[in-house]
């Protein structure tokens, strides 16, 4: 596979059909050739780092992930979060081929800003997939429902000429002869 980067970037993993890069997306996306990518899967910061607690492996642990999960020391405002999302989504659009798609995972903490940013940056959301976790962490605060799902937004460039690929028959085959639904468990 030809290297998709205008400037050399070390690859984390590579096969004949794909290249995986690990690093700061703002730096990496600016080094990529325009319209060179068929599909992007993004798992951006959820902005959960708020000095709270969660359960991991049966133990209470901090939800603070690191500085990358916070935009400022005073926390992350809605405006900061949305500006951040628009910035990286705009860079993704530049490198995505005309028929390419982007998949973005998130939780209620960030996914609504991401959906709006996608539309503002000229994307059309194809599907809103709900991933139901089989073993979510318990709700330690006991003040709301247990967070047991994540959302995956699947989108394409909002252009009348844009034609994304979807192998309907393969999905049906993988799902016991039935249409694949937008709620996944795992």
Where is each model-derived feature located?
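Core catalytic lobe of class I
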Residues: 1-186
């Amino acid at each position: 596979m030809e290297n998709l980067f205008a400037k050399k970037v070390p690859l984390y993993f590579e096969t004949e059909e794909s290249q995986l890069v690990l690093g700061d997306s703002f730096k990496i996306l600016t080094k990529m050739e325009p319209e060179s990518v068929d599909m992007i899967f993004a798992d951006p910061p959820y902005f959960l780092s708020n000095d709270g607690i969660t359960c991991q492996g049966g133990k209470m642990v901090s939800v603070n992930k690191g500085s990358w999960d916070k935009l400022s020391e005073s926390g992350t405002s809605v405006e900061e979060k949305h500006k951040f999302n628009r910035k990286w989504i705009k860079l993704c659009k530049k490198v995505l081929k005309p028929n390419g798609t982007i998949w973005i995972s998130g939780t209620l903490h960030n996914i609504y800003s991401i959906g709006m940013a996608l539309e503002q940056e000229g994307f059309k959301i194809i599907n809103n997939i709900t991933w139901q976790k089989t073993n979510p962490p318990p709700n330690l605060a006991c003040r709301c429902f247990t967070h047991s799902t994540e959302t995956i937004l699947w989108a394409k460039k909002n252009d009348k000429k844009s034609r994304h690929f979807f192998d309907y028959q393969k999905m049906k085959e993988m799902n016991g002869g039935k249409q694949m639904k937008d709620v996944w468990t795992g």
